[in-house]
């Protein structure tokens, strides 16, 4: 949801699915601010978003697809561990559910173009 206000709504799908991993990342956001009003605003926004989205679990099929994702990234000479791991697990979830992956950070998914449709929604 970071940067979502800058995204052209025409670039976004009409039906929204979100990985449980993405939801976990988003859910930590309100706790990163010290201002109570801002924390409440962020929490409300996440809850409203979650109510409209289909949340996709990271399950065994996703774990197996992650192996393919990992190999594809390593084949490009990039590291597939550390901070990048969660993004790659999100990609594996999209692969299993045969969904395109909408992102503001398409470069983070370099090497996965043969496995998944990556939709760059950045300006």
Go through each PLM region and give its residues.
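Short, hinge-like loop/turn segments at secondary-structure boundaries
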Residues: 34-37, 74, 119-122
């Amino acid at each position: 949801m970071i940067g979502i206000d800058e995204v052209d709504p025409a670039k976004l799908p009409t039906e929204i699915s979100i990985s449980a991993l993405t939801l976990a990342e988003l859910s930590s956001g309100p706790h990163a601010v010290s201002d109570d009003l801002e924390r409440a605003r962020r929490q409300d926004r996440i809850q409203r978003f979650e109510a409209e989205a289909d949340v996709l679990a990271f399950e065994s099929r996703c774990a197996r697809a992650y192996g393919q994702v990992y190999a594809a990234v390593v084949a490009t000479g990039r590291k597939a561990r550390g901070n990048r791991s969660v993004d790659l697990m999100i990609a594996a979830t999209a692969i299993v559910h045969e969904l395109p992956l909408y992102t503001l950070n398409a470069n983070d998914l370099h090497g996965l173009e043969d496995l998944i449709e990556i939709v760059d929604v950045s300006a």
